[in-house]
Amino acid sequence: MAALRMLWMGLVLLGLLGFPQTPAQGHDTVQPNFQQDKFLGRWYSAGLASNSSWFREKKAVLYMCKTVVAPSTEGGLNLTSTFLRKNQCETKIMVLQPAGAPGHYTYSSPHSGSIHSVSVVEANYDEYALLFSRGTKGPGQDFRMATLYSRTQTLKDELKEKFTTFSKAQGLTEEDIVFLPQPDKCIQE
């Protein structure tokens, strides 16, 4: 009887405190047997999805960018992205620090100071990679972003479908998803 009472009290406490939520679909999962050396090189950000209000406001003016992934001295990754912004080519460098399993990284935003978890969830290395990032922007403001990297600037319909399904599995909606158009400069070979 005492064991049953303890079980009941435990269930009540979980209900009061908020039962731990399971991720929408493996936020922290990574590509099995992730091979960082095969992930290196040139990628194009062909699709993005995010619950960020900034993203929702700006997604109509975003373009595909070129990202070169190189190893960092700390065992992580340096991502150098070139993109079109206000009719100018700009470059941004992100440093991803290794965090746990191969394919899982953290990124510290110099702008907001927030820390984001970044996972390479799926990659075939020669064609595409699906990444998922999450973090917080402030109290009660969770941030989620799915990214579709492509080795080419042209996407197959199957990849668009795969990315849409992947994004929705992360709790993002159809209006959170955008496939980025190619700009007329900044990402040429």
Swiss-Prot record:
Keywords: Cytoplasm, Disulfide bond, Endoplasmic reticulum, Fatty acid biosynthesis, Fatty acid metabolism, Glycoprotein, Golgi apparatus, Isomerase, Lipid biosynthesis, Lipid metabolism, Mast cell degranulation, Membrane, Nucleus, Prostaglandin biosynthesis, Prostaglandin metabolism, Pyrrolidone carboxylic acid, Secreted, Signal, Transport. The lineage of its organism: Eukaryota, Metazoa, Chordata, Craniata, Vertebrata. Catalyzes the conversion of PGH2 to PGD2, a prostaglandin involved in smooth muscle contraction/relaxation and a potent inhibitor of platelet aggregation. Involved in a variety of CNS functions, such as sedation, NREM sleep and PGE2-induced allodynia, and may have an anti-apoptotic role in oligodendrocytes. Binds small non-substrate lipophilic molecules, including biliverdin, bilirubin, retinal, retinoic acid and thyroid hormone, and may act as a scavenger for harmful hydrophobic molecules and as a secretory retinoid and thyroid hormone transporter. Belongs to the calycin superfamily. Lipocalin family. Its EC number is 5.3.99.2. SUPFAM superfamilies: Lipocalins (SSF50814). Induction: By IL-1 beta and thyroid hormone. Probably induced by dexamethasone, dihydrotestosterone, progesterone, retinoic acid and retinal. Repressed by the Notch-Hes signaling pathway. This is Prostaglandin-H2 D-isomerase. Disulfide bonds join 89-186. The modification Pyrrolidone carboxylic acid is found at residue 25. The keyword Secreted applies. Its main location: endoplasmic reticulum. Monomer. Pfam families: Lipocalin. Disruption phenotype: Mutant mice show decreased susceptibility to passive cutaneous anaphylaxis associated with decreased mast cell degranulation. It is found in: Rough endoplasmic reticulum; Nucleus membrane; Golgi apparatus; Cytoplasm, Perinuclear region. Glycans are attached at residues 51, 78. It comes from the Eukaryota. It catalyses: prostaglandin H2 = prostaglandin D2. Gene3D superfamilies: 2.40.128.20. One of its GO terms (molecular function) is fatty acid binding. The active site is at 65 (nucleophile). Abundant in the brain and CNS, where it is expressed in tissues of the blood-brain barrier and secreted into the cerebro-spinal fluid. In the male reproductive system, it is expressed in the testis, efferent ducts and epididymis, and is secreted into the seminal fluid. In the eye, it is expressed in the pigmented epithelium of the retina and the nonpigmented epithelium of the ciliary body, and secreted into the aqueous humor. Low levels detected in various tissue fluids such as serum, normal urine, ascitic fluid and tear fluid. GO terms for biological process: gene expression; mast cell degranulation; negative regulation of male germ cell proliferation; prostaglandin biosynthetic process; regulation of circadian sleep/wake cycle, sleep; response to glucocorticoid. The keyword Secreted applies.
